């Protein structure tokens, strides 16, 4: 996809019962060498990541695990990772000011004009508005980027491509199963 001037990225479904550094290392190996328009890794944290959702782990334990993963992404990939979550889990587990420095990809399937953003964030980078994209032959999510093409380049893994202008602004689609963003 890099040859078609599309941005692409990977995400890690963070598991709380496995070492966060090893999980990040595995994701980085799977992504391979960075190319132009490759986005930094997204850390995905949502209810389905818990083995037993009815037995929520302590907030501090969850926060330590997520922070360890985020810091390791930053150190290893030399870029700022994005956090993907929904409002309920963001409010419950990601309410520490330490998370505000990481861009937010909020899952909020609403018809509203703006998503609900959990504290400590006041804004979002990406908004997943729906789990289906009309007119797509493949299963795809409907995501909106809160910025323009220059802003999107700031999420790149490759420093030289952080200011590319593609002429495309605003809306992204992401294919499930890691195929496209």
Regions found by a protein language model. Give the residues of each.
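Functionally critical loop-and-helix segments that line ligand-binding/catalytic clefts
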Residues: 95-181
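A short secondary-structure junction signal
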Residues: 54-55, 85, 92-96, 138
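Structural recognition of the beta-strand scaffold that forms the well-ordered cores
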Residues: 7-12, 39-45, 80-84, 103-107, ...
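Conserved N-terminal glycine/acidic-rich loop preference
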Residues: 60-66, 91-102
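Substrate-binding cleft of extracellular glycoside hydrolase catalytic domains
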Residues: 1-76
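Aromatic-lined carbohydrate-recognition surfaces of secreted/lumenal glycan-active proteins
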Residues: 76-91
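Solvent-exposed loop/turn segments at secondary-structure junctions
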Residues: 8, 14-19, 46-50, 87-91, ...
